[in-house]
Amino acid sequence: MKPDYISIPDWELLTKKYLDTNKLLELLSTGYPPQYLIGNVEFCGNIINVDERVLIPRFETETLVDKTINYAKEMFNKKISIIDLGTGSGCIAISLKKNLDSFVTALDISNDALEVAESNALLNNT
C-alpha cells in the first residue's frame, strides 16, 4: 500500500528493497533522505547515483547548470576547459560535458566522492 502522505514515485522499488516497511517508514520519519534510499536522482536528464558519501543534487543547482550551458554556448565558439571543484556526485561535470564542447576536470578532496563521481561518469557515458 502506497501512503498518500509520502511523495516517493519509487515506493514499490523501496518496499522491495527494504522488505520491512515499518523500518522504511521509520527512516523516512527521521528525515533520512529518500534519495539515499532509492540510490539515485535525475539531474539535467542524467541518472546520478547518490549515497551518504555525496550530497544530493539540488534543483537550484540544475538551474545554475542550465544557465551556465546557455551562457557558454553564447560566449564561446571553441572547445572550452572547465574545472568542477568539489565535484561530489559529479552531476555538474557530467551535465556540462554532455551539453558543451568541452574538456571537463572534476576534483574533490574526498576519495569516496570521486568514486561516486567516476561511477556516475561511466553510467552516463561521459
Where are these regions (language model features)?
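Auxiliary N-terminal substrate/complex-recognition segments of SAM-dependent methyltransferases
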Residues: M1-T126
